[in-house]
Amino acid sequence: MNLIELDQALRKLRLSGMATVLEARLRQAQTERMAPIDLVSTLVADELLRRQDRLLERRHKQAGFRDPDRSLDTFDFEFNRKMNRALIHELATARFIAQREDALLLGPPGTGKSHLAQAIGRAAILQGYRVTYREAHTLIEAIADATLDGTRKDLLADLATVPLLIIDDLGMRKLPATAGEDLLELIMRRYERASTVLTSNRPVDDWGKLLGDTAAVTALLDRLLHHAHVLKCGPRSWRTKVHTDLRSEEATK
């Protein structure tokens, strides 16, 4: 079997990681006089690395992040120094997911809640967890649509089992009258079974008015807060800072 035939055989066996580097590794083996076992070990390591990279890429895509490049490395901790940096880094370890705990990120618009939630989600993927990201209004609308077309049971089953569900921007848009009950059912299915990160620009005392069902919200908060890490974001807003900087630039022209 020549090199071309070997490459084709490896790809048929779905060993594309080996096939991609085969020629280079064979040259390396000759140059370094590698033992056969060392060459095989190196090729296997190449295959495992490629599969891991493809798995991470697939999970990042499946997560559905709104801003897929968000990370803790790109978050400006100096802008809001009062934020609990230790808690943020603790959440990024994903230990709270292993312990089936939740996290609430609360604060005014523009204070970094969505950035941090997605950064925590990316960190969780790197540590082997599946993650689903949904903006609150699209999640609630999806559940309502699934109720109408008969797929509600399947949708809730999928959402209930993902190890980390991120519900972003609760309170940014008006929600349907069924939002409270739908969100409660989802959280009850996940309670002590999987982790949820929820961000909101509204204090929890306002959630009854927001979701239109005080009783459902009371039960919802009871479960969310039972094993929850609460991060207060702010008080300074990045959006306000940008507008202020722009006004300052205009004033100096």
Residue ranges and their predicted role:
Residues 85-161:
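Conserved P-loop
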Residues 164:
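Walker B motif beta-strand of ABC-family P-loop ATPases
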